[in-house]
């Protein structure tokens, strides 16, 4: 396992649309493990592959309910709306209020290539939306109001 340096705002990979994963190889499994190690080392609740410099459609999320790994995730259903404060490991020292769907259903593949569908609400729904935005080259600051800079 390895902890990678998180890519920060200004790096062009964060503006790219990440490439779909066509085959789940041992390298993809290793990527998921390294992403989780990195997320935990940085005390994050989610991480997308582009945040460690890899243009692949993979995310890891853990909001305190256990690690979720998703390959080629997509949001298939949304409902409601709520505004809350977000931050991002790739935009250190910055927070802002972002309006997101209150509930989402996310579909993707697990590390075994099995399709999984996850209904989510609250922080988990927000984390999924935030990380999937990363896969589409979108940073939270592009959607945020009341942006505040905090000490690093």
Swiss-Prot record:
It catalyses: N-terminal N-formyl-L-methionyl-[peptide] + H2O = N-terminal L-methionyl-[peptide] + formate. The active site is at residue 131. Keywords: Hydrolase, Iron, Metal-binding, Protein biosynthesis. Its cofactor is Fe(2+). Binds 1 Fe(2+) ion. Its EC number is 3.5.1.88. One of its GO terms (biological process) is translation. One of its GO terms (molecular function) is metal ion binding. Fe cation binds at residues 88, 130, 134. It holds the Pfam family Pep_deformylase. It is an enzyme of class 3 (hydrolase). Belongs to the polypeptide deformylase family. PANTHER family: PEPTIDE DEFORMYLASE (PTHR10458:SF22). Removes the formyl group from the N-terminal Met of newly synthesized proteins. Requires at least a dipeptide for an efficient rate of reaction. N-terminal L-methionine is a prerequisite for activity but the enzyme has broad specificity at other positions. HAMAP family: Pep_deformylase (MF_00163). This is Peptide deformylase. It comes from Carboxydothermus hydrogenoformans (strain ATCC BAA-161 / DSM 6008 / Z-2901).
């Amino acid at each position: 396992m390895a902890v990678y340096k998180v890519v920060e705002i200004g790096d062009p990979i964060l503006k790219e649309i990440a490439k779909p994963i066509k085959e789940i190889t041992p390298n993809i499994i290793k990527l998921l493990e390294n992403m989780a190690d990195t997320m935990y080392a940085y005390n994050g609740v989610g991480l997308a592959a582009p945040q460690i410099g890899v243009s692949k459609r993979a995310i890891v999320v853990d909001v305190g309910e256990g690690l979720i790994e998703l390959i080629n995730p997509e949001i298939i259903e949304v409902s409601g709306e709520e505004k809350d404060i977000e931050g991002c490991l790739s935009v250190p020292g910055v927070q802002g209020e972002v309006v997101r769907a209150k509930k989402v259903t996310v579909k993707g593949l697990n590390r075994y290539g099995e399709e999984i569908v996850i209904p989510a609400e609250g922080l988990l729904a927000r984390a999924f939306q935030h990380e999937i935005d990363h896969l589409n080259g979108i940073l939270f600051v592009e959607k945020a109001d009341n942006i505040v800079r905090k000490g690093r």
